[in-house]
């Protein structure tokens, strides 16, 4: 829609420029016609007064020529002023048209770059939803593997599940999936989401004391933040006491 609107504006500028050029040409033609008419009138005046007495003829001829010259001069001056105004308008319209054209070209180039970047990102992160949906059953599998048991048969099954879990993690790592480090790390709202807070003056302030749910990066983009329990001193002065 934006490009269509800008194209309409450019078309309007072209139309206005053509109209101004047409007016300019008409004014030039009018000036030529006025000059020709003045010359013809002077010739007619000379023929009209040929047969009159010399003094009267000379006086009238001088007066007529003087008036004719003044009228012609005024008309020419007026036309020259109009031509100058039209030239200025034409120059301004051309400048506006050129600036609009350059602006549209720059915006179109930027639009192509944004569209290309968006397309590349869509391809790059096309598997985001699939991987995110895969993480939940993978974490459930980890909980099953970590379950303590004395049953030898069950332990063999759990060993097989553990090998499967490692293979899945390896595939995810190869695709660019990374686990966000959070335990005992300073709380960072960019990567961590605090579900619980505790106050323990034996531990550093604003530190993650426990991971409630693992967080992951996918090709350096946050796939989901880590849910943590954060140590937050309710009164820092109390520790000094």
Curated annotation (Swiss-Prot):
Keyword annotations of the record: Chaperone, Cytoplasm, Stress response
Domain of life the protein comes from: Bacteria
GO biological process, one term: protein folding
Disordered: annotated span: 28-78
GO CC list: cytoplasm
Compartments (UniProt record): Cytoplasm
Disulfide bonds: none
SUPFAM superfamilies on file: Coiled-coil domain of nucleotide exchange factor GrpE (SSF58014), Head domain of nucleotide exchange factor GrpE (SSF51064)
Basic and acidic residues biased stretches: 28-49
Statement: the UniProt record of this protein carries the keyword Signal: no
Gene Ontology MF annotations: adenyl-nucleotide exchange factor activity; protein homodimerization activity; protein-folding chaperone binding; unfolded protein binding
Xref: Gene3D superfamilies: 3.90.20.20, Head domain of nucleotide exchange factor GrpE
One Pfam family in the UniProt entry: GrpE
Low complexity bias (residue ranges): 50-62
Family matches, as InterPro entries: GrpE, GrpE_coiled_coil, GrpE_head
Entry's family note: Belongs to the GrpE family.
Subunit note: Homodimer.
Function: Participates actively in the response to hyperosmotic and heat shock by preventing the aggregation of stress-denatured proteins, in association with DnaK and GrpE. It is the nucleotide exchange factor for DnaK and may function as a thermosensor. Unfolded proteins bind initially to DnaJ; upon interaction with the DnaJ-bound protein, DnaK hydrolyzes its bound ATP, resulting in the formation of a stable complex. GrpE releases ADP from DnaK; ATP binding to DnaK triggers the release of the substrate protein, thus completing the reaction cycle.
Name assigned to this protein: Protein GrpE
Originating species: Aster yellows witches'-broom phytoplasma (strain AYWB)
């Amino acid at each position: 829609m934006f490009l269509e609107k800008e194209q309409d504006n450019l078309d309007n500028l072209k139309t206005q420029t053509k109209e101004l050029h047409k007016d300019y040409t008409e004014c030039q033609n009018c000036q030529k016609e006025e000059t020709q008419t003045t010359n013809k009138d002077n010739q007619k005046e000379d023929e009209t007064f040929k047969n009159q007495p010399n003094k009267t003829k000379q006086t009238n001829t001088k007066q007529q020529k003087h008036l004719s010259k003044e009228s012609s001069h005024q008309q020419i001056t007026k036309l020259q002023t109009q031509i100058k105004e039209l030239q200025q308008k034409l120059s301004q319209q051309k400048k506006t048209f050129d600036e609009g054209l350059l602006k549209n070209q720059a915006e179109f180039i930027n639009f192509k770059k944004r569209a290309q970047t968006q397309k590349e990102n869509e391809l790059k992160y096309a598997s985001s939803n699939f991987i995110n949906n895969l993480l939940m059953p993978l974490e459930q599998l980890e909980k099953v593997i970590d379950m303590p048991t004395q049953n030898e048969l069950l332990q063999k099954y759990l060993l097989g599940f553990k090998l499967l879990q490692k293979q899945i993690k390896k595939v995810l790592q190869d695709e660019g999936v990374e686990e966000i480090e959070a335990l005992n790390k300073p709380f960072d709202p960019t990567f961590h989401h605090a579900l619980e807070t505790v106050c323990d003056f034996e531990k550093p302030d604003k530190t993650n004391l426990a991971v409630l749910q693992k967080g992951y990066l996918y090709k350096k983009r946050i796939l989901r933040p880590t849910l943590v329990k954060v140590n937050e001193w309710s009164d820092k002065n109390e520790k000094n006491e």
